[in-house]
């Protein structure tokens, strides 16, 4: 039996029902009113979309390789071969750490990094950037921080300088360490820094006996066709069972219960009446269309450039902006806060014509010395080209994928 087959079988086992599917036990006329069902399905899908996209990436990067709670370091700058996350950068080496916080917190130790930009971005299951460590937020000195899940009750060790608490059991800790590819030996320097990034369960850090592991070790599979149909509800319900629902959203989640949504609910699409299913599918289709066309919410247009608004942030910053959150996940999941990075982009020339180099056209982007992008100490700027609609880097004969302040 291949490893892939074992993983698939592990996924197919799924989870046992915890609650009955509420739609079919509901006496309210709303439960079968197509207009109401469609509206709820649309609202629920927009809310769920970034959580589904996050889980898709977690499945590809952590579940498939069973690599929770350990760093995976990129050893070279990303190019066209990298297709895990849209709009990757070609300026930093990624250090990816998927955290499973169900049993206990994780302690991360980072060395002093004084000669370049670095950051660790903590992303929860809602795709909120709930914490940062790095050059901008915690400085350039050595640092020890701890990330805990929503149900942890304990004491932070004295020598742990920062405690970050997640709203969910699973967290993406995404590290970025800048590389100057035009300087000989700089890549090797960053590889050395990466090896000093360390992560341990709290019990190991304290030299104590570890707690019992979580009894839940099966995960539903992400499948694109199901994730874009009424079947998304099964996965969404699983994810809701892994987070604390914010008080501001409890009433909304209860309203979603009209169509079978709730933490741990078992959803059985085969029991849907045709009229109800059709209404739900129409709502999902409209949600996907709104997400696809959410560009005006994500940025403003100026001189053919899209200037990004605040589309990533913590819960307070993103509260209630569910379509923005979904559109941002579709455009480029795991983007940074405005305070950390700024992402202007363009798909057209100064005359409004689409950028298209396939016909032999050439384009020039010109900065005067006075107009070069300004960055803070140890910051950087770059321009990267992506293909459309996939939003990945473009293969080219000279293997150059970005230009910026470090380009000779």
Report residues per predicted region.
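Bacterial N-terminal signal peptides that target proteins for export
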Residues: 2-15
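Alpha-helical transmembrane segments and their juxtamembrane interfaces
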Residues: 19-20, 53
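C-terminal motif of bacterial Sec signal peptides marking the signal peptidase cleavage site
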Residues: 22-25
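A compositional/structural signature for long, glycine/proline-rich flexible linkers
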Residues: 28-408
């Amino acid at each position: 039996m291949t490893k892939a087959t074992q993983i698939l079988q592990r996924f197919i086992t799924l989870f046992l029902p915890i609650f009955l599917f509420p739609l079919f036990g509901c006496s309210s006329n709303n439960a079968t009113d197509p207009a109401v069902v469609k509206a709820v399905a649309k609202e629920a899908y927009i809310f769920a979309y970034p959580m589904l996209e996050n889980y898709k990436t977690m499945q590809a990067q952590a579940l498939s390789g069973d690599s929770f709670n350990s760093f995976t370091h990129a050893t070279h700058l990303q190019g066209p071969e990298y297709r895990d996350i849209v709009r990757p950068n070609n300026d930093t080496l990624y250090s990816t750490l998927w955290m499973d916080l169900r049993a206990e917190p994780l302690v991360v130790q980072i060395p002093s990094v004084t000669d370049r930009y670095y950051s660790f971005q903590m992303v929860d299951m809602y795709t909120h950037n709930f914490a940062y460590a790095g050059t901008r937020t915690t400085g350039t000195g050595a640092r020890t921080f701890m990330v805990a899940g929503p149900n942890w009750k304990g004491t932070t060790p004295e020598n742990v300088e920062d405690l970050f608490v997640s709203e969910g059991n699973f967290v993406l800790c995404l590290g970025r360490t800048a590389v100057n590819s035009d300087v000989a030996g700089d890549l090797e320097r960053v590889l050395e820094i990466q090896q000093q990034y360390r992560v341990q369960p709290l019990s190991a850090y304290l030299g104590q006996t570890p707690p019992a592991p979580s009894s839940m070790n099966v995960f539903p599979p992400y499948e694109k066709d199901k994730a874009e149909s009424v079947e998304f509800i099964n996965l969404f319900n699983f994810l809701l069972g892994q987070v604390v629902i914010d008080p501001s959203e409890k009433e909304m989640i209860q309203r979603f219960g009209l169509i079978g949504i709730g933490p741990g609910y078992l959803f059985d699409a085969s029991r849907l009446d045709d009229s109800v299913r059709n209404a739900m599918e129409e709502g999902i289709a409209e949600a996907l269309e709104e997400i696809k066309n959410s560009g005006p919410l994500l940025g403003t247009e100026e001189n053919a450039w899209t200037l990004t608004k605040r589309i990533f942030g913590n819960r307070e910053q993103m509260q209630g902006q569910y379509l923005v959150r979904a559109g941002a996940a579709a455009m480029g999941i795991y983007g940074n806060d405005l305070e950390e990075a700024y992402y202007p982009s363009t798909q057209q020339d100064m005359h409004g014509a689409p950028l298209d180099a396939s016909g032999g056209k050439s384009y020039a982007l010109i900065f005067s010395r006075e107009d070069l992008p300004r960055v803070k100490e140890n910051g950087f700027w770059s321009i990267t080209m992506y293909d459309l609609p996939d939003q990945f880097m473009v293969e080219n004969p000279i293997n150059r994928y970005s230009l910026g302040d470090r380009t000779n």
